[in-house]
Amino acid sequence: MTNNKVALVTGGAQGIGFKIAERLVEDGFKVAVVDFNEEGAKAAALKLSSDGTKAIAIKADVSNRDDVFNAVRQTAAQFGDFHVMVNNAGLGPTTPIDTITEEQFKTVYGVNVAGVLWGIQAAHEQFKKFNHGGKIINATSQAGVEGNPGLSLYCSTKFAVRGLTQVAAQDLASEGITVNAFAPGIVQTPMMESIAVATAEEAGKPEAWGWEQFTSQIALGRVSQPEDVSNVVSFLAGKDSDYITGQTIIVDGGMRFR
């Protein structure tokens, strides 16, 4: 299946990002897998498209504005158009409030917030160039809907992403551009595993205890899989979501009711 549309996914080498890229290829998109881990991005793109016709890999540090603009421009040049930007890349360190350093602050905000802002700007540039609307999809989190203990930096960045999403949706609506966000809950990914382990270590407890601090709140009784999230991104990237903008879809199995 092909829909002749082009998408870019940041943080696409593994976890949720890879599953999003995989689903978009299944939906007929040509996809750029963008990641700081160049080898990981190449492996992901090769898995998605052995001949490079449906997926390409691009190395980028999303906290660097030039990197993001260059990645989007390269994607548009390679595939001849640009339609969907998925700002998925993120960092999720455990940061008790008194332990946060200036370096940590700059690093996490650089990736989680600046990376989204640069992605919005870079996508907008291409939508204007090709003289059509488009879709921008940002990764926030259930931790961007309600603060989680011990995650000061992560939570505050994800709240910021929701704000950026709402403002950009209003600023760009007249150009036929929708801007929405998805808010995963506890997803079985390497990043979530590191958070669960760190939470347990902080408390001097086993890893299983760390997971329990998060999973006990899930109404549907199971940890989310990356596919649960990629299904929602597929909807936001497709025509069925054309009349939705400025919204955050919570994909957490019933952790937060807002």
Swiss-Prot record:
InterPro entries per the UniProt record, alphabetical: 23BDH (IPR014007), NAD(P)-bd_dom_sf (IPR036291), Sc_DH/Rdtase_CS (IPR020904), SDR_fam (IPR002347)
GO BP annotation list: acetoin catabolic process
Keywords of this entry: NAD, Oxidoreductase
Binding site for NAD(+): 8-32
EC number: 1.1.1.304
Keyword check for Chloroplast: no
Active site residues of this protein: Y154, K158
SMART domains hit by this protein: PKS_KR
Any Pfam family matching the protein: adh_short
GO MF annotations, alphabetized: diacetyl reductase ((S)-acetoin forming) (NAD+) activity
Catalytic activity of the protein: (S)-acetoin + NAD(+) = diacetyl + NADH + H(+)
Keyword Membrane: no
Binding site residues for substrate: S141
Similarity annotation: Belongs to the short-chain dehydrogenases/reductases (SDR) family.
Biological role stated in the UniProt entry: Catalyzes the irreversible reduction of 2,3-butanediol to (S)-acetoin in the presence of NADH.
Name under which the protein is recorded: Diacetyl reductase [(S)-acetoin forming]
Organism encoding this protein: Staphylococcus aureus (strain Mu50 / ATCC 700699)
Source species taxonomy: Bacteria, Bacillati, Bacillota, Bacilli, Bacillales
